[in-house]
């Protein structure tokens, strides 16, 4: 669980990086990134930066209730499976959500076990078909039976995009978009009902259209970031 963090003004002199990053492994599952405020990221190079970067077929993670402001491609799923992007605010980002199908050309199931793109070999080193892996992550245990190269099982639900350049960046996904679950997203809302967007106060007014989304859960923005306690000098 990675929650209630404020990450800002990072990646000012680099590219192909995220405020949060993980990648190239089917087994790094179960991470929950919740209630983080990610903003004002750098944007160098052709690839740029990502808010939360699930790179190279990373799978089985949950991105819930985060606020992205000027955070490149905010929620980035690079060919992975069974990821959840839910209840997030994406504001003035290059793209609210990114999806691609890189696994169809990059995963090498018959390569040497030491090859970083042999994702099956990485899973086999952990006996992924046996408990505790198989009981905790049953979709991982059955991955080889369900078109393992494809970006299946991803859910993009109840997200809000405001003044983003694009709602969706979907490189090479023409054949697979209908296998992604999209539901109850506000893809380009005119007025989300922020208290004061000009001052980056992204709390929602009581009359906000966002609050009418089925199942919308309040994001505790006021709790995000540093706080004073007995261990903090200043």
Which functions belong to the PLM regions below?
Residues 17-18, 69-70, 137-142:
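Short Cys/His-rich Zn2+-coordinating modules
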Residues 93, 98-234:
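Acidic, glycine- and Ser/Thr-rich low-complexity intrinsically disordered tracts
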Residues 23-25, 53-55, 73-77, 143-150:
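Short, contiguous acidic/charged loop-to-helix segments that flank catalytic cores in large enzymes
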Residues 1-12, 24-46, 51-55, 59-72, 81-95, ...:
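Right-handed parallel beta-helix
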Residues 6-7, 11-18, 42-50, 71-80, ...:
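Short glycine/acidic-rich loop motifs that flank beta-strands on beta-rich extracellular proteins
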